Amino acid sequence: MSVPGDVRGRGLSEPPNLNREEEEEEESHEVLLSVLAQHGQLGLCFYDSRDFTLHYMPDTSDNHQLQLLARVVQEVSPHVIITSAKQERCMVQFMQGLGANPDYRPEVVTYPNVDFGLEVSKQRLLSAHLPFLPPAVSERERISYLSSCISFDSPLMLRSVGALLKCLDRRRVGVELEDSSVGVPILQFHTYTLKDVVYVDRDTYSVLQIFKSELHPSVYKLQSGEKEGLSLYAILNHCRCKFGSKLLRQWFLRPTRDLVVLNRRQEVVRFFSCPRNSDSLNTLQASLRNIRNIPTLLRTMSLSHTKVSDWQGLYKTVYSAVCIRDTVRSLPQSIQLFQEISEGFSDDLYYIASLISRVVDFEGSLAENRFTVKPNVDPAIDEKKRRMMGLSDFLTDVARRELEHLDARIPSCCVIYIPLIGFLLSVPRLPSMVEKEDFEMEGLDFMFLSEERLHYRSQRTKELDDLLGDLHCDTKDMETAVMTQLQTTVLERSACLYKVLDLSAELDCLMSLSHASQEYGYTSPTLANHRRITLRQARHPLLELCSPVFVSNSFLSSETRERVKIITGPNSSGKSIYLKQVGLIVFMALIGSDVPAKEAEIGLVDGIFTRMQSRESVSVGLSTFMIDLNQMAHALNHSSGHSLVLIDEFGKGTNTVDGLSLLAASISNWLKRVPAEVPHILLTTNFHSLLQLGLLPSSGLLSLLTLETAVDGDELVFLYQLKEGICRSSYAANVATLAGLPPSLVQRGVEVSELYRTGKTIKRIDRPSTEEQANKCVCVVEKFLCVNLEDQSVDLQRYMKEELLPSGGDLL
């Protein structure tokens, strides 16, 4: 074999070996997921040893089936799952389900609940091995930096981080062969969002008033909870059942960019928003009022703790579900949700409804406060009840015959039936019957004394017990057996009931959005996967409800031009409202709702980032400006070309020059990116020098806007109309006058501002500044200049005391 052939052969054989090494390296990486679930909230994080990155997901709500956690596990595929040994039942069931899956069985590690302590977890995070930080960094600086990387306002997530760090240190993931002093490195922190779920943080939810909790006005409910104030959720939530409201809240907490899901929602909203379909809307909403919490009902049945009210609730639920199905079947089946309801609400519902109707005697059950069955269900039960109904006359006849054999002193008697005891002879207590020995009668067995009546068991009552038995208890036992059989039948067909819950909740949410669209005059937006956003005559969904007149404004952001909009204008001119308006409209589109605009075309975004409000936290002692910087850093580091960024007055919390510099640098950072990576940015500022000094690079991506105002004499009039241009004046004095500041104070402010702008001396007004004082100042300065400070023979103390102080003392 020739040498070239050998060389060529090795050249062909080496790449497969390299590929195998790469595959082995790929397979050797490990993903560890730490999760904690409490009271419907979920916090989790995971570490990927391939790139030494810690991914975290802020606390979010999840249902009792932990569907959100299931999606995370499906996407991440962790090798190890870390959780607390003290967990809720839903988490235990979830882990058992993972263990039963033969195709995927991650290792489950449980730590004591103390290892998930909040303070312990914070200390572990502060002590983590972060190679990108200088060794000499102080604890305070480390806290400031970490607060910009990870949210300290999510306690469940922070606790899961603490447990994850402990597991990493124990297993020494990625540093198994290193010295024990070498810690597991964390090279970066990343916020984790599920595929097609839009990132929206807590600050954004708060500043846009998507949710707003208020104390309940009722004095009886001050301690029990809160009520929803004026918020987007409050005005869109017209759901008729609780689980519909709960699902709508989940949609708000997880806005999606999945076009298939959004189109599915939009077609239902469009259908019910049409006035000619209002009858169907009202009929369905009336039926939805009767849908109860099906999982709770079925769980009660499985434990055999079913009450009469539970049977009533189940019957109303199933009957209403049948009515919903019949109504929906008359609607267009081209709409996917209608088709699923028509098929998913199977005939099992009608079977369950008719079975409950035939078996359960609701009137009798309410009267006896227990489960009773209707006639003709069980002949044996009917016979028992027939005997009990005729028992009164029969016992009267027996008592008459018993009286003939009693002591002549006994004036009357009766035969009574007591459940569990049986038939007894009851006679009145005579005055001579004082002691227990006086109660004894021949042929009778004394049982007890109650309410001045003596109760005995006679031969005839014993015969009645043998003949009739314990009618009441026997009937109750037989009816309980029927109830158990009915429960079993219902539970066997429970799959259709869970479909009722899911589809009814979705239908309720979409009809709620349709109701809001009709009431407030919304428009169905056109959604697409491009990077454009176009809004014509858009309105603020909350402010228009509080103001008699609202001025609409448009918004346009194309893929390659005018993506960065800088808005200037006086205070109170509507800059912040415009930012919130755009943010809310985009958010509404991401949950499938119609929007307050004449026309809307919205390219789906992957995140909404805001720097508008400093939400201070006691968990991390940061200044207001530091919180602002963290929000800005988060937007700079995590926004993409498909994001929406809203920035309001960034930089005002520090020195003017420093704030202006940071603002200019941040905008320049975005403008220097390639157009495909520049997000939609709306920025308001009162730093007019940002534009006047030319601190920003010229770019077609930049658009300068202002809000129109008019000056009528000394009065400033806000027109709230957006137009292209720059605001040349802040009109601070006019705004101060509108705010009610004293005219003298405003006038003084104008004078000082003009003197400062022109570089002239600002004279004090608390005492007169005379020419004589100015001359004295010149004299003192000249005497200072005459002194040779380098001359060692000069006695400065004597010079100050004898020369300077006498001439300049009254200036002090």
Predicted regions mapped to residue ranges:
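Secondary-structure edge/capping motif, primarily at the C-terminal ends of alpha-helices
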Residues: 272-279, 298-305, 328-332, 402-406, ...
